[in-house]
């Protein structure tokens, strides 16, 4: 896979914003087939920063909307810690 295919989107919530401010950790959705080594190489190539990576698989959850029921899509999440003094510009106002 190419580096740009591995990283899908940032996960932006209140919890992830606190992680960015306090611990310099960024959270992203990544390809399900990607491993830690590939994710690390992708971030270092695209953003030109040194990182450490933790990954986890987020399981599908059961959801219901009226009479319709189903499951949300599962995905792989990567929490990327950037070395101190460096940043990743994931939003326009960074």
Curated annotation (Swiss-Prot):
Classification via InterPro entries: Nucleotide-bd_a/b_plait_sf, Ribosomal_uL23-like, Ribosomal_uL23/eL15/eS24_sf
UniProt entry tagged with the keyword rRNA-binding: yes
Coiled coil: none
Matching PANTHER family: 60S RIBOSOMAL PROTEIN L23A
Annotated GO biological process: translation
UniProt cross-references to Pfam families, sorted A to Z: Ribosomal_L23
Source organism of the structure: Phytoplasma australiense
Descriptive protein name: Large ribosomal subunit protein uL23
GO CC aspect terms: ribonucleoprotein complex; ribosome
Protein family per UniProt: Belongs to the universal ribosomal protein uL23 family.
Domain of life: Bacteria
Quaternary context: Part of the 50S ribosomal subunit. Contacts protein L29, and trigger factor when it is bound to the ribosome.
GO molecular function: rRNA binding; structural constituent of ribosome
Function: One of the early assembly proteins it binds 23S rRNA. One of the proteins that surrounds the polypeptide exit tunnel on the outside of the ribosome. Forms the main docking site for trigger factor binding to the ribosome.
UniProt keyword terms in alphabetical order: Ribonucleoprotein, Ribosomal protein, RNA-binding, rRNA-binding
């Amino acid at each position: 896979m190419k580096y740009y295919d591995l990283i899908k989107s940032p996960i932006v919530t209140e919890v992830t914003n606190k992680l960015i401010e306090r611990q310099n950790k960024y959270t992203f959705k990544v390809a399900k087939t990607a491993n830690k080594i590939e994710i690390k190489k992708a971030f270092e190539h695209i953003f030109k920063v040194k990182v450490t990576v933790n990954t986890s698989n987020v399981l599908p959850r059961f959801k219901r909307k009226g009479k319709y029921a189903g499951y949300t899509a599962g995905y792989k999440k990567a929490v990327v810690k950037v070395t101190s003094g460096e940043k990743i510009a994931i939003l326009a106002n960074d």
